[in-house]
Regions:
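Detector for outer-membrane/organellar transmembrane beta-barrel domains
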Residues: 213-335, 392
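Positively charged n-region of N-terminal signal peptides that target proteins for export
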Residues: 1-4
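Outer membrane beta-barrel
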Residues: 22-50, 54-183, 199-217, 252-267, ...
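Bacterial N-terminal signal peptides
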Residues: 7-15
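Transmembrane beta-barrel outer-membrane domains
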Residues: 71-75, 108-117, 151-155, 198-202, ...
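Transmembrane beta-strand segments that form the barrel wall of outer-membrane beta-barrel proteins
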Residues: 92-103, 177, 220-226, 314-327, ...
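Outer-membrane beta-barrel "beta-signal"
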Residues: 347-349, 373-394
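Outer-membrane beta-barrel translocator domains and adjoining extracellular loop/strand segments
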Residues: 44-49, 106-112, 138-145, 183-197, ...
Length: 394
């Protein structure tokens, strides 16, 4: 209840700020949508992720989550946001506060408030939680399924950003909140690993450059990060260590008549938490002198087509995948390859109302035990959007 009170207070403050603007040029936009998903999964998947396609959440062994699939109903995609635009001398202060109902982390599987954006910028500087420059949100296709292509870089992060070039062509450089995860593999549960804790002495550094074209754009991005861990166990053997993570991305949108082609290729080491659906950043590598942590190489790819049949009828279809180069200390059932594909038919009879049906397929392959599993995901969705602007002379 307290969270709802805070949310309501923020909205009301935004409205009040607009109403009190001296020159009438300040503006507040309230927007969002209500979305309902109804569908079925052919196979039993991780119940915390019952309404999305995530190859990493398919079972790693037979009957891990049960024998058969199930029907699902969900409103977790429902979204609400507030944007403000305030004159500040020769510049403009822009803020975005946006949330949805899709629980993750400790709230995985729940219908609860999840912060998407809490971000502000003025001129060439920005701060807050927003899209990482390493990702390209315009690669995301018009899917009904919430999670999206597993092979794209996708991460909202707390950051400080500098944008020396803005517009259709742009350059962004950011310092981002660091973080990572580890897979202890065959060494999981061993006493000598129990006292190891992560440490991040430096922020992640990311950058993007987009070149605007007449029929779309081409974008390149990169990221560098330091991942450290410390052994706090009072033993003669010190398992502390560190690795450097890095990643490169190339992406594009090409507009061809009534079509938009969305493409991305990502490769790096130790950047799995910047990917849309990938496992741990660090794995165990066994050597003649023992075992050490290594940054796991990852490659992701996305190829989707959005096609408009008419002004009211459209389709999105495509394929994506993630490949992990597993270390020799990871367990045989560790995640190795994930594939993702779907096609849909969307209909918008009037503005702000949309319905559609979608058929999706995903597949998981393990590291070395020969296990693989496929799942078919079918859903119908109904979406009602709203947007209202206050102020700005209106």
């Amino acid at each position: 209840m307290k969270r709802w009170i805070v949310v309501l207070a923020v909205v009301m403050l935004g409205i009040a700020a607009t109403a009190q603007a001296e020159n009438g040029k300040s503006r507040t936009e309230i927007y969002g949508y209500v979305m309902t998903d109804v569908g079925v999964n052919q196979k039993a998947i991780d119940p915390s992720w019952f309404d999305v396609q995530r190859p990493t959440k398919l079972p790693a062994f037979e009957n891990e989550f049960g024998r058969d699939g199930s029907v699902f109903f969900s409103v977790r995609q429902t979204r609400f946001g507030v944007k403000s635009f305030l004159p500040a001398g020769d510049a403009e202060i822009k803020t975005t506060f946006e949330w949805e109902m899709f629980g993750v982390g400790a709230d995985a599987g729940q219908t609860t408030i999840r912060l998407r954006h809490a971000y502000g910028e003025v001129g060439k500087f920005g701060a807050g939680q927003y899209w990482s420059p390493f990702m390209d949100i315009d690669v995301f296709p018009n899917t009904l399924e919430y999670w999206g292509p597993n092979g794209m870089a996708f991460f909202r992060n707390v950051q400080l950003r500098f944008m020396p070039i803005q517009g259709d062509s742009r350059l962004t450089i950011a310092l981002e909140r660091p973080g990572a995860s580890a897979d202890a593999g065959l060494y999981a549960g061993r006493v000598e690993l129990a006292g190891i804790v992560p440490r991040f002495p430096l922020p992640d550094v990311s950058a993007e450059y987009r070149m605007g074209l007449r029929r779309g754009y081409i974008e390149v991005a990169g990221i560098v990060r330091t991942i450290k861990w410390e052994d706090l166990t009072p033993t003669p053997v010190d398992a502390s260590g560190d690795v450097m993570g890095w990643g490169l991305s190339a992406s594009s949108n090409l507009k061809l008549g009534g079509n938009v082609v969305r493409l991305q290729l990502v490769h790096g080491e130790g950047i799995e938490n910047y990917m849309n659906d990938a496992p741990a950043d660090v794995g165990i590598e066994v050597t003649t002198s023992g075992a050490d942590g290594v940054a796991l190489p990852v490659t992701g790819a996305v190829a989707f087509l959005d096609h408009n049949w008419t002004s009211k009828l459209s389709t999105s279809l495509g394929y994506s995948q993630v490949v992990i180069e597993n270390s020799n200390g990871q367990a045989p059932d560790a995640f190795h390859l994930g594939q993702y594909a779907l096609a849909n038919l969307l209909y918008s009879p009037v503005p702000n109302v949309m319905g559609g049906v979608e058929v999706g397929w995903d597949k998981r392959e393990n590291n070395s035990d020969g296990w693989s599993i496929e799942n078919w995901h079918v859903q119908a969705s109904f979406k009602y959007s709203f947007s209202v602007s206050l102020g700005g002379g209106q």
